[in-house]
Amino acid sequence: MDSNISDWHARFRDAEAALNGVVLGQARTIRLLLISALCRGHVLLAGDVGTGKTTLLRAMARALGGPYGRVEGTVDLLPTDLIYSTHIAEDGRPRIEPGPVLEQGEDMAVFFFNEINRARPQVHALLLRLMAERSLSAFRREYRFPHLQVFADRNQIERDETFELPAAARDRFLMEIAVDAPAAPEDRVALAFEPRFHDTTALIAEVGQGILPYRGLNGLAAGVQSGTHASPALRRYVFDLCEALRNPASAGLALEGADAARLIRGGVSPRGMQHLVRAARACAWLEGREAVLPQDVRAVLAPVMAHRIFLSPAYEPRREALVPALIDAAFATIPVPAA
């Protein structure tokens, strides 16, 4: 068993190095994607146009290996388009072909929804079931996708012909990760001037196919969750952080320009806390530890929790500034347990 765990650690190190080699300046996002794979959780990337979201998700899908489905979000996309398509065959008869969800079979490893905010709410509803249950009903039978991980991205710039994801759909994503352009000038220069980064298909092919064998991840994830421990003090720390995000005024949090007592419309759910714990355990395992430390919780709290915090309507227009400030205030206020 120990040798098997050692092999998995080596695979994750290789995958992280390969992904960082083809997607520059996104080390934090790559680590979070690996944590999500280890948790078997779905991921939504949000960012500006041209920041590498699609390239990163395609590279991650290649690292996982296995069948891979993809759909482009458009305003005229229908739920049935995910399941099947129809056309007139050469013999003049109508034919039904599997859509992007079914064409790869039940062994599908990754389903990638590009520009998810361009799809209508009816499509989001179908995706919600696929994410929540990893199953789908079609053609009088039930299809099950035990290895499925859903990746999606959305463009934060364009607002025309877009539809905001409902809270229920966003809550099904383990993480919502903000992707910005690389901060280091040398990375931006390399992306602009090195031809290697101009051919996206060839670049992604540099990532070894199936570095992280997807069929083994369910068993590994279960072992990580059962074998990575959290002390009573750490458990209390997680609880206090989540309570502070639910009721900042009671926790003594202060935010400039906001009334803490009126800030929150809906806070962290029990499922959100479960996801936080799962991600923190995966983070600890990737660091080679058998126990969760406060830094593991802090490393994953924002991407796991930010999209699960619902502000009062008066404060929602300032969400991008207030939610990070709220999380920082919780970190500053809630005492960190001793190691």
Curated annotation (Swiss-Prot):
CDD domains the UniProt entry points to: AAA (cd00009)
Gene3D superfamilies reported for this sequence: Magnesium chelatase subunit I, C-Terminal domain (1.10.8.80), P-loop containing nucleotide triphosphate hydrolases (3.40.50.300)
Protein name (record): Protein MoxR
Biological process according to GO: methanol metabolic process
MF terms in GO: ATP binding; ATP hydrolysis activity
Cellular compartments per GO CC: cytoplasm
Highest rank taxon of the organism: Bacteria
Organism, scientific name: Paracoccus denitrificans
Residues reported to bind ATP: G47, D48, V49, G50, T51, G52, K53, T54
Keywords, comma-separated and alphabetical: ATP-binding, Cytoplasm, Methanol utilization, Nucleotide-binding
SUPFAM superfamilies: P-loop containing nucleoside triphosphate hydrolases (SSF52540)
Subcellular location: Cytoplasm
